[in-house]
Amino acid sequence: MFLAMAALACAIGLTVKYGSTYRPVVEPVREIEEIWALEDAREESEEPLVTRLFCNGVPMAYDAENNVFYGSLGLDNGAQWPEIKLTASEETAKGLSLCFADDYGFDDCDAAIREGYSYQIFAYTDTAYSYAEVVFTGLPLVNVTAEQTIEREDVPAQIEIALAAEGLQTNGRIHKRGGASILNDKVGYKLEFTRTTDGKKKIYREIPGMGTDSQVILLPMNALDTTMMRDRLSWALYARLTRRDEPFSARKTQYCELFLNGEYRGVYLMLEPFSVRQEVAKAGEERLTTDSVYRTAVISLSHGRPCMEDPYSAATGFELYYPMDGEPDFSPLADYFALLGETDDAAFMRRAAQSIDLDSALRYDVVLQLFGLTDNVINNMYTWAQNSRGHTRYRFDFWDLDVSWGLKRDEIGEMHENWVFFPLVDRLLRADEEGGVRQRYGEIYREVREKAFDTEMVEALVGQYAHELNDSGAMARNAERWETENYAADGYELVAFAAERIALLDEPVRAMSAGEEIDLRFLEKTNYDDKGTPLSEE
C-alpha cells in the first residue's frame, strides 16, 4: 500500500453522530515526533479502537479483516481534493482522539483514488492506541450488516449506501438471488428497505445515484463476463428504445462496491428491479384485474414460484409473476401454446395476427439479434397475457440482459455469426407470404440501429464504464479479492462484437424486409433447445 509519510494532522475529542454537526478529524499538521510520543505513553491495543467512521457525514464502509475504512468521493474531483471531514459516532468518540498519520494532500485526488492509495489514521485514548487505514473510491459504497445467515429467504439487515456527499442509512432486509450463479462464490443479492428493524413494512428511500425506490438488486455480474460491462451496456442501449412511463422499460444501473458484515465483496452492478405489478399498471389500472405475466425459466433453476412445464421443452417452463394472490392460474397461456402447436402455416399466421402483439415480438427479436442475447427465450423472457373482453393478446419483454455480446455459455461458441432462435418470430418471418411481417421487422430493425446500436454508441459507453471501473480503483480491488487476472477493464471485445453483428445482420435484414430473394435457412430450424445457427455458411 502507498504511504505518504510527509505530514500529520490530528483532532481531539470527537463527539458527533451521523446527521449532526460534526468536527473534522484532520487538524493542523503536527510533527512525527508528536505521534511517537503519544505511542510511547500508551499500550498498543490488540483490537482496533475504532471500527465506525463517517466521511463528510456519510457512513464509511469497513473491511474488518484488513482494518481498512473506505470512503466514497465520486469521480468528478480531478487532482484537487474535496474538503474531507472524518468523524466518529458519539458512542465511539467518547474518550477517543483520531488523526491522520499520512497527509493525503501530498497526492493528487484522482491518482489516489485510481491507484487505491491507503492512508494511515492513528486512534488513541488515555491508555491505548491503534492504527487503521483509509482508502478512497470513486464508486458508491454499499455496506450491509445482518445478524442472521443470508440465504434465499429474507433476513433483517442494516443497509448503508454512500456516494460522495450523499448517504442512506436504513433498516431493511436481504436475500441471495440468482439461478445458476447462486452456486458461485460471488453471489447476487436483493436489498429491500423497511421502516422497522425486523425487516417488515417496506418503504421507499432516496438511493444515492439511483433515485427513489424501495429495493435494489446487486448483480455480481456473470462469472464469465470478464469485462463486467455486458449487463450495464445492454440496459443503457435499451434505454434509448424505451420511455420510463412504458411498461418494462430499461432499468437504471450503476457500479458499486459491496461490504457484507465487514467483508469486502468486490464490484457489483446495482440494478433497479422490476415491480411487475407496477409495470402492468403502466398500461392502465384496469389491467391489474385482467392480465397475467409469466417468465420463461429453466425449471431446475426456477425461483420457487408456481411454474408450468413448457409443452415444447421439457426442461423449461413458465413461472407465474403476476398475479400472486389466489390460486396459480396458467390458463391465460392456452392460446399461446395452441399457436405454437399449430402445424399449418396459414392457420398459424391467422392465429398470430389475432393473438400476438407484433411490434412487441419483433422489437424483442431485433434486440435479441443485435445484442447477441442467448439466454432470453426459453429463459428470462416475460410473456404478458393481456386480456380484453375474453380475448388474449401476448406481449414480450426482457427479464435480464446479462448473457449477451458474444458471451459463451454451454459451449455454443461466441455467437458472432449466429442468428439467435426465437421460434415464434422465426416462424412469423418464414411463413410470411404477404411480406408485411418482414417489412415491419425491417422498419423496427432500422429504428433500433438508428436509436440504439452503432459502434460509436457502444464505444462511448464502454469507454465510460472503463473509466468508472479503472479510475475508481475498484476493478483492481475486485481482481485482488477474487483472485482473477482482470485488473483493468477495457471492453474492446464488446465494440468488436457490435461491429461484427452490424456487418452480419444489416444486409440479410434489409433484403428480407424488401422482399428480395434471400437464403432463409437460418430461420428454418425452430428447435426450442437450440440457441442459434450461422447466418452465413461462409
Where are these regions (language model features)?
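Middle-to-C-terminal accessory/interaction subdomains
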Residues: G172, F330-S331, A338-I378, W384-Q386, ...
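Internal "kinase-insert"/substrate-recognition segments embedded within catalytic cores
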Residues: T197-D198, E206, G211-N222, P247-S249, ...
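N-terminal module-boundary/linker segments of secreted carbohydrate-active enzymes
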Residues: E33-E44, R114-H175
